[in-house]
Amino acid sequence: MIRFILGRLVKAVFILLAILVFNFLLIHAAPGDPAAVMAGEAGAADEKFLADLRARFGLDQPLYMQLWLYIKGAVQLDLGYSFRQQMPVAEMIGDRLPATLLLTGVAFVLSLVLGVTAGVAASARQGRWGDTLISTFALLFYATPLFWVALMATLVFSVWLEWLPGFGYSTIGAGYTGMAHVLDVAKHLVLPASTLGLFFTAIYMRMTRASMLEVSRLDFVKTARAKGLTRGVIQRRHILRNALLPVITLAGLQAGQIFGGAILTETVFAWPGIGRLMFEAINQRDYNVILGVFYISAAMVLLFNLITDVIYVIVDPRIRLTT
């Protein structure tokens, strides 16, 4: 297992390096002069001031040298300096990352638990009203745009009913500490986490249902029924364990989509995470922040995929541990 994990880590390093190079070249291929943006308005500053800015941020060097310096800094977690916020990018991301991990983590667990549970329930009631009802809701959640769900959730539960706060990480100026602070954050987390998780709940539900029905038709399940095992035992020990394999694979692949969905969710709910930081950086053309968020997001996705591979091996020991 250790050799397997080390092999995956080596591959992840090379993949991350390729992502760094691609994102760097993509950002620098965009039209516009970063130095002019730093000056406040394009063309508003004289050439000497723009030249000083280019020299300060290394923009006067050849592209290959800028790329080398960026990769060298990224290895040391030195992601550059934000000219807009006047602070290191690594510090900015470090301040925002816990909020994003909390949001995406809760949304991921919520969607996985609800999706698998609903999928199992639907497969057990195939062709009946329960299956139809669950499948209809899953299709509805899957087809509805995320931003519309976020806006409607805010309008209904925050504006009309006033049950839940519609924006922010915690109550401004409340000064809560200890358990009171935890409960306050949890209350603010309900709407964004539920909104982000609904789409993925529908995906996991549909995948679990289809996988459960497929596995239930295999020979070993028929053998288990012939031995007189109860329906619950067959569902839990034989069908569900094998049906979860494609769900686990899908969950690992969609880690990046959850981070992508966090950008929109955090923007609508004013959640202070790296998704909102990315949105602000794009509007301000703060290139170092954009590259820094790309870097951290790619690293997190690769980490999730590694965890998925390990879980896959644990769930199905028949899989060979090859690097």
Q: Language model features by range: what are they?
A:
Residues 9, 49, 53, 63-79, ...:
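Hydrophobic alpha-helical segments of integral membrane proteins
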Residues 16-68, 161-182:
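Hydrophobic alpha-helical transmembrane segments of membrane transport/permease proteins
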